[in-house]
Amino acid sequence: IDGAVQFPILFELNQGQGQGDQVKTQVAAAYKRPSEADASRWVLSSYFTSDWMPATTARTAMPLALDMAHLYAALLQGLMPLPVRPQEGLPDWIARVELAANKRREVEKTQARLIKEKQFNRKVEINAILRQLKSALEQLSR
């Protein structure tokens, strides 16, 4: 759906049936921007999601915004896993979040490699790489 519609979409996902706490709700959205190569196409970032919450949870008020772009940015801000830096625009913030996610996956792969490695000298090398990756991830997360 997101690829077909050329406007930002905020998805509300529902899980379960019936009444009460069995029904859960999650909000998901992806940042959309026009493609640099083809103006008729849109480029999607990865999806940002909220936690699953009971459907009976009280809804928060919509943020105040002067136009739809600012409203969508304010709604995305609540779903982002990292805080915004001062003077950081939404596209830069999205790029930093995606870079941090890639770095996190790289840390997990390196940790798995460290566990599988048997030779001590290779473990020392992998551990040094792991420390560098973790410090880079920490820099991105601030």
Label every model-predicted segment.
Residues 62, 94-97, 120:
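Charge-dense, low-complexity intrinsically disordered segments
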Residues 1-88:
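Selected N-terminal structured segments and early membrane-anchoring regions
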Residues 83-86, 118, 141:
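Long, hydrophobic, amphipathic alpha-helical segments used as structural scaffolds
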Residues 120-131:
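Short, charged, amphipathic alpha-helical segments
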Residues 124, 139-142:
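TerminUS-proximal long segments
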Residues 96, 100-117, 133, 137-140:
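Non-transmembrane amphipathic alpha-helical segments
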Residues 84-98:
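Short, charge/polar-rich alpha-helical segments
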